[in-house]
Amino acid sequence: MIVLQAYIKVKPEKREEFLSEAQSLVQHSRAEEGNAQYDLFEKVGEENTFVMLEKWKDEAAMKFHNETAHFQGFVAKGKELLSAPLDVVRTELSE
């Protein structure tokens, strides 16, 4: 199992647009085969800082996700929504 935590800093004026885009991404990603979890949380005490928590069955499932239209669209849109580059932490859980 692959676990990704993506720390996302959003421009304050783009917050609502980001949340709308992220909600769509979460919905589509959860429907993918190989996805075990896909959730967005706002970091406590840090307004406009979010954590996307993803769990994938294996490398192939994660690779497939990274190539989907909904993920690629979110990444492209992120350039105008984010105030800092993504900080992604990857861990692997033994089964």
Curated annotation (Swiss-Prot):
Pfam families: ABM. It comes from the Bacteria. Its EC number is 1.-.-.-. The modification Phosphoserine is found at residue 24. Induction: Strongly induced by stress due to exposure to 6-brom-2-vinyl-chroman-4-on (chromanon) and less strongly induced after exposure to 2-methylhydroquinone (2-MHQ) or catechol stress. Residues 2-93 form the ABM domain. The keyword Phosphoprotein applies. InterPro entries: ABM_dom, AI-2_Isomerase_LsrG, Dimeric_a/b-barrel. GO terms for molecular function: catalytic activity; monooxygenase activity. Keywords: Aromatic hydrocarbons catabolism, Detoxification, Monooxygenase, Oxidoreductase, Phosphoprotein. GO terms for biological process: catabolic process; response to toxic substance. Belongs to the LsrG family. Putative monooxygenase that may contribute to the degradation of aromatic compounds. This is Putative monooxygenase YcnE. The gene is ycnE.
